[in-house]
Amino acid sequence: GLIGSIGKALGGLLVDVLKPKLQAAS
């Protein structure tokens, strides 16, 4: 449904933002 789609979009955005920080930290 709509809520699931929004959740997926936010989750993808979060991963895009956090992944570079995690890679930079390691």
Curated annotation (Swiss-Prot):
This is Citropin-2.1.3. One of its GO terms (biological process) is defense response. Expressed by the dorsal and submental skin glands. The keyword Secreted applies. It is found in: Secreted. Its main location: secreted. It comes from the Eukaryota. Keywords: Amphibian defense peptide, Secreted. The lineage of its organism: Eukaryota, Metazoa, Chordata, Craniata, Vertebrata. The keyword Manganese does not apply. One of its GO terms (cellular component) is extracellular region. It comes from Ranoidea citropa. Pfam families: Antimicrobial24 (PF16049). InterPro entries: Frog_Litoria.
